[in-house]
Amino acid sequence: MAEKFNRKLILEDGEEYLGYSFGASSDKVLEIVFNTSIVGYQEIISDPSYTYQAVVMTYPLIGNYGICEEDFETAIPSIGALIVHEYNDEPSNFRSMESLSETMKRFGIAGIYGVDTRQLTRSIRELGSRKVLITGIETTHSQGLEILKNTQIPKDSVSKVSRAQNRFYPAQNRKYNVVAIDCGMKQNIVRSLVARGCSVTVVPWDTDAEKIAQLSPDGIFISNGPGNPEDVPKTIETITKLRGKYPIFGICLGHQLISLSYGAKTYKLKFGHRGGNHPVRNLKTNKIEITSQNHSYAVDKESIKGTDLEITHINLLDNTVEGVECKKDKIFSVQYHPESAPGPQDSAYLFDEFIKLMEEGKSNA
């Protein structure tokens, strides 16, 4: 006899999907999104940008290679849940230290498998991201809808995932001192900077400009992170004060915050960009780069007109803004993840562009 379903998803518009539990069995109300990556589920569950989200993996088989300690993107994953079609609880990988389900239990990440992820993804594409309840099979449909109606997703995601104190990452052959504002920073960003001779001081999201200046940076990095960029006005204020004084490089949420600091606007996409194969055109070189992306919001193209920003990159799937710069202020940013993890490395050169700006600053000092 087939195993009985023991978990379910109830979406706020009434859709319902049945499945089986893996990972933690806690009930949660989250925002449902999907990711099209084939591999990289460990980096996905440990990416702070997925805070308060339930991620549907479109690739049908997840868990094959287990979990490797050194591949985490943050020490304490904050993703809400993982939704998959088929889960493999017997990984084959000499580097694996435990199964995906064991890791998810350890960090309280809910999981459900056996779900028709093709239909669910199609629903998200057609109707957009929305609230979902992950719960036990005993929860009735009407009970689930009532819970969804009365539960709001918190807006404190950046403060939740940002570190509370400064942390220093030394480079073996230090050439530059970078201060990174942590809005939910992935570890591979730190690795990418350190590998290029940057000693990195990671500071909390709400660190003011004066304290950052006291660290004598050669350049400032604004990290990725979760949620609505308009929910972190403190960081926008800090960027505004630092503009023109130091070279600044921003990624993902950092890109949105930089744009807002110049007076541009942001808006929420219908279902966001999440995956490792998004084509982007570099307008300066006319080359196409395949990029890794994970974001719900985008910078409004029309709102950039009249600011000091210039659009540098465009998404070829929906023509949204993927990069901006202000040459006179030595500041630039991209909506995607050049550090990959997971994903292609077509855009890793952007870290080298940041290095060039810092080198120019040192030469002109």
Regions found by a protein language model. Name each.
Residues A2-E210, Q214-L215, P229, A341, ...:
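RNA-binding accessory domains that recognize and position tRNA/RNA substrates
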Residues A110, N177, P247-F249, K265, ...:
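Proline-centered loop/turn at the N-terminus of a beta-strand
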Residues D116, C252, H295, H337:
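Active-site glycine-centered loops adjacent to acidic/histidine catalytic or metal-binding residues
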Residues Q172-V178, T285-I288, C326-I331:
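Beta-strand-turn-beta hairpins that frame and shape the catalytic cleft
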Residues K175-V179, S199, P247, I290, ...:
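Residues that mark the start of a beta-strand
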Residues D218-I290, S296-K301, G343-G361:
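Cysteine-nucleophile active-site neighborhood
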Residues K287-D329, A365:
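Catalytic beta-strand/loop cores that center a nucleophilic Ser/Cys/Thr
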Residues G323-A365:
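A glycine-centered loop/beta-turn motif at secondary-structure junctions
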